[in-house]
């Protein structure tokens, strides 16, 4: 029989790997954005996005830009493809993090 604790830690590892993939895709999206739309790059604070002095309100702008699918009207196909990928990975990572939290609560109740 598989241990529930081992299953929980396996789920945590999968979640962490997907978070790393999401951040990597987001970083690649910002590189493409810098080349194809410098104004939007500045609008979302692309240069300081992953720094400690980054501006969270500008970072949230990019999240809402992708969440609302406003990128669909963009002229660059590569940028549209990257936004779609980041959006799918964000949804997957959010679902996995939710599952980890629910699993943790279940483990605390049952053990």
UniProtKB/Swiss-Prot annotation:
Protein name: Universal stress protein B
Disulfide cysteine pairs (residue numbers): none
Organism placement in taxonomy: Bacteria, Pseudomonadati, Pseudomonadota, Gammaproteobacteria, Enterobacterales
HAMAP family given in the database record: UspB
UniProt similarity note: Belongs to the universal stress protein B family.
InterPro entries, per the entry: Universal_stress_protein_B
Transmembrane segments: 1-21, 90-110
Cellular component per GO, a single term: plasma membrane
Organism: Escherichia fergusonii (strain ATCC 35469 / DSM 13698 / CCUG 18766 / IAM 14443 / JCM 21226 / LMG 7866 / NBRC 102419 / NCTC 12128 / CDC 0568-73)
Name of the gene: uspB
Domain of life: Bacteria
Presence of the UniProt keyword rRNA-binding in the record: no
Subcellular location: Cell inner membrane
Keywords from the UniProt entry: Cell inner membrane, Cell membrane, Membrane, Transmembrane, Transmembrane helix
Pfam family, one: UspB
Membrane topology term: Multi-pass membrane protein
